Regions:
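Extreme N-terminal starter segment of soluble prokaryotic enzymes
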Residues: 1-4
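Short polar catalytic/cofactor-binding loops
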Residues: 6-13
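Short beta-strand scaffold segments in enzyme catalytic cores
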Residues: 78, 93-96, 137-139, 220-222, ...
Length: 269
């Protein structure tokens, strides 16, 4: 089973870990269980400097996440954890941790949110403190082959196509969409990516008014390879879940083999 937690993370990592612990106590007893967390679940700061300070001690928090995985016998897709680089910046790293507490995959967010939005924040400049990643990540798991993305990556269909070609059956999209962009684009983009890649899309989201002054859209959602909404949580803290049917996924890919029909390649331009 896979579940997506919807969270309203705050300024302080310790408090956010405690919120996570409380939410984990409410989850079903089904095992194996993959728990997907939203972007910035560990710290949703007012400044890149505050996040950078957390990034420089990320090992401490990753150890706490590993301990939770062992305690609850779960796999954890840790939305984003800031991990310091050598350039006084940090990666927005999506980590996959198994039920033994081992980090089995790390994806560093590739596309950074340098955008102007008509909301209370106005200007977002993620690249001021975040270093972009370069590599796609697909990893085997008891739940299927998992492809990792983060939030703004959702707008770049080529990344999702690359994940599908690399074998992804389930694509995770931990996010902290603004209320403005979320209302306009969130579900249409997620549905399109699920249909295009014929994959399950699991999108755990931040929700509500945060201590840093930001407001996020929520609407955590799970979408099937056919584009059906399997579960959604519009507002509030909580969780949604599904049991992916990989036989159904492969039947869809067999009956409509769009990848084998694909003739367009960017390198031909």
């Amino acid at each position: 089973m896979i579940v997506a937690l919807q969270m309203c993370s705050g300024l302080y990592a310790d408090a956010n870990i405690e919120q996570l612990n409380l939410q984990l106590q409410q989850l079903p007893a089904t095992r194996p269980l993959l728990v997907c967390l939203p972007e910035s679940f560990l710290v949703f700061s007012k400044s890149g400097q505050q996040t950078l300070a957390i990034a420089k001690q990320s090992d401490v928090y990753i150890q706490q996440l590993s301990d939770l995985c062992r305690q609850y016998d779960i796999w954890l897709a840790a939305g984003t954890v800031p991990i310091a680089t050598a350039h006084d910046k940090y990666f927005a790293a999506s980590l996959l941790v198994n039920n033994q507490g081992d980090v089995v995959a790390q994806y560093n967010k590739m596309h950074l949110f340098d955008v102007d939005v008509a909301d209370g924040t106005g200007a977002y400049r993620e690249s001021n403190f975040t270093q972009a990643g370069n590599d796609i990540v697909v990893v085997d798991s008891p739940f299927g082959k998992i492809g990792l993305t983060v939030c703004y990556d959702l707008r770049f269909s080529g990344l999702f196509s690359a994940l599908q070609r690399a074998g992804a059956e389930i694509i995770l999209v931990p996010s902290a969409f603004t209320t403005v962009t979320g209302a306009a684009h969130w579900q249409p983009l997620l549905t399109a990516r699920a249909i295009e890649t014929q994959s399950y899309v699991i999108a755990a989201a931040q929700v509500g008014q945060h201590e840093n002054g930001r407001a996020t859209y929520g609407h955590s959602i799970i979408i099937s390879p056919w584009g059906d909404v399997l579960s959604e949580l519009a507002n509030g803290i909580g969780f949604i879940g599904c049991q992916p049917d990989l036989n159904r996924l492969h039947a869809i890919r067999r009956d409509m083999p769009v990848q084998s029909h694909q003739r367009f390649r960017e390198h031909l331009l």
